[in-house]
Amino acid sequence: MSMLFYTLITAFLIGIQAEPHSESNVPAGHTIPQAHWTKLQHSLDTALRRARSAPAGPIAARVAGQTRNITVDPKLFKKRRLRSPRVLFSTQPPPEAADTQDLDFEVAGAAPVNRTHRSKRSSSHPIFHRGEFSVCDSVSVWVGDKTTATDIKGKEVMVLGEVNINNSVFKQYFFETKCRDPNPVDSGCRGIDSKHWNSYCTTTHTFVKALTMDGKQAAWRFIRIDTACVCVLSRKASRRA
């Protein structure tokens, strides 16, 4: 009887040691495929090992919420499904102006080759020809100081400002487009019949994959950024008696 009891206790202890602790490794509210999370966890383990050997000051800064110069595995950036033409990791600031047509072209699945040629083509063939106007005026810029954002589940997450890849510091940029003015003309949107319609310009959003922090863990998440300026219409009430 004592031998059977000892065997059961031993099996129970082995089972506890062999049980995977996945809940402590996976960020809450995130659904990463297991293969991808394994690679991400490997890079985090590497970063933690380096952090333990670093001075106490930088470690305390990271724990306090700093999201700069976090070491990540370069293999994470080879996943094609994680790429977005509106998200850029670069060691230097990108050009001030960018071609939104190129961004849409790349989203559709075309290979981003010969970008210089497309830029020249766009500059020689403007979007609006003589006599053509935009209903709403928009402005597009590369944003490199984003610290927080809203994820696809409505939760506010911390955005990684910089990452360390192969001992080089890359900054995370987001190409955002928003309305320059909600009312480009006194009546609202340009070219709309104000006698029958109310109108105004508003910024719309989309979700892109970005590197974020959740607690002490880095992970890819869909975050919301500004991507377009559109005209909103509503029919005016009839004045019939």
From Swiss-Prot:
Any one of the GO CC terms: dendrite
This protein's record includes keyword Secreted: yes
InterPro entries: Cystine-knot_cytokine (IPR029034), Nerve_growth_factor-like (IPR020408), Nerve_growth_factor-rel (IPR002072), Nerve_growth_factor_bsu (IPR020425), Nerve_growth_factor_bsu_mml (IPR020437), Nerve_growth_factor_CS (IPR019846)
Entry's Gene Ontology molecular function annotations: growth factor activity; metalloendopeptidase inhibitor activity; nerve growth factor receptor binding
Compartments in which it is found: Secreted; Endosome lumen
Keywords assigned by UniProt, alphabetized: Cleavage on pair of basic residues, Disulfide bond, Endosome, Glycoprotein, Growth factor, Metalloenzyme inhibitor, Metalloprotease inhibitor, Protease inhibitor, Secreted, Signal
S-S bridge residues: 136-201, 179-229, 189-231
SUPFAM superfamilies attached to this UniProt entry: Cystine-knot cytokines
Gene Ontology biological process: cell surface receptor protein tyrosine kinase signaling pathway; modulation of chemical synaptic transmission; negative regulation of neuron apoptotic process; nerve development; nerve growth factor signaling pathway; neuron projection morphogenesis
Sites where a glycan is attached: 69, 114, 166
Propeptide intervals in chain numbering: 19-121
Stretch forming the signal peptide: 1-18
Function: Nerve growth factor is important for the development and maintenance of the sympathetic and sensory nervous systems. Extracellular ligand for the NTRK1 and NGFR receptors, activates cellular signaling cascades through those receptor tyrosine kinase to regulate neuronal proliferation, differentiation and survival. Inhibits metalloproteinase dependent proteolysis of platelet glycoprotein VI.
Similarity field: Belongs to the NGF-beta family.
Subunit structure: Homodimer. The homodimer interacts with a single NTRK1 chain. The homodimer interacts with a single NGFR chain. The NGF dimer interacts with a single SORCS2 chain (via extracellular domain). The NGF precursor (proNGF) binds to a receptor complex formed by SORT1 and NGFR, which leads to NGF endocytosis. Both mature NGF and the immature NGF precursor (proNGF) interact with SORCS2 and with the heterodimer formed by SORCS2 and NGFR (via extracellular domains). The NGF precursor (proNGF) has much higher affinity for SORCS2 than mature NGF.
Protein name: Beta-nerve growth factor
